[in-house]
Swiss-Prot record:
Molecular function in Gene Ontology: proton transmembrane transporter activity
Complexes and interactors: F-type ATPases have 2 components, CF(1) - the catalytic core - and CF(0) - the membrane proton channel. Component of an ATP synthase complex composed of ATP5PB, ATP5MC1, ATP5F1E, ATP5PD, ATP5ME, ATP5PF, ATP5MF, MT-ATP6, MT-ATP8, ATP5F1A, ATP5F1B, ATP5F1D, ATP5F1C, ATP5PO, ATP5MG, ATP5MK and ATP5MJ. Interacts with PRICKLE3.
Subcellular location: Mitochondrion membrane
Domain of life assignment: Eukaryota
Protein name stated in the entry: ATP synthase protein 8
Organism (species): Sciurus vulgaris
């Protein structure tokens, strides 16, 4: 069984890490960030649903046992 030649693994791994580093640096450098992000006023919205104004069984108190 032939021996696995691992002599080129070091330079391959180092060059791969360097290439990935350069790729991510160029992606981050081209990304535009907002210089001063401002807070957007969020007003709470109220939804009018038909079951809010109705008296349904789920809103009734626990009923007493029948006598």
């Amino acid at each position: 069984m032939p021996q696995l030649d691992t002599s080129t693994w070091f330079i391959t791994i180092i060059s791969m890490i360097l290439a990935l580093f350069m790729l991510f640096q160029s992606k981050i450098a081209n990304h535009s960030y907002y210089s001063n992000p401002s807070h957007k006023d969020m007003k709470p919205t109220t939804h009018s649903t038909p079951w809010e104004k109705k008296w349904t069984k789920i809103y009734l108190p626990l009923s007493l046992p029948l006598h």
